């Protein structure tokens, strides 16, 4: 298996997530996929419009999986500010404002 965007392929190895997750920012690709190299089967996420993409895994048996999470802001740091307003890149809406987003995930055989 590998992680693929329109320009690069990263092999999924047992040690890829040894140091936790990978947070990528401002990717130029519109999609990011996890592809089974022998069959071409894939899970593809449209990441267009998402400034951050987090990829993480819990490779322990019996449930091995990889998660692609497109994000609009960054997670809080372990020792970072506790208030939402003080977090870097945190989005906030004023009273009466609305906001929406769409995430499209495709399963390919």
Residue ranges and their predicted role:
Residues 4-48:
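Active-site/ligand-binding surface loops and adjacent short beta/alpha elements
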Residues 36-79:
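Glycine-rich active-site loops that engage anionic ligands at enzyme catalytic sites
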């Amino acid at each position: 298996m590998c992680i693929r965007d329109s320009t690069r392929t990263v092999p999924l190895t047992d040690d890829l997530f040894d140091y936790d997750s990978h947070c990528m920012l401002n990717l130029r690709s519109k999609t990011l996929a996890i592809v089974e190299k022998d069959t071409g089967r894939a899970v593809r996420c449209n990441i267009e419009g998402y400034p951050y993409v987090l990829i993480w895994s819990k490779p322990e048996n019996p449930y091995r999986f990889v998660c692609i999470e497109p994000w609009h802001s960054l997670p809080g740091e372990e020792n970072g500010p506790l208030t939402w307003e003080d977090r870097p890149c945190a989005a906030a809406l004023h009273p009466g404002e609305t906001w929406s987003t769409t995430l499209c995930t495709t399963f390919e055989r």
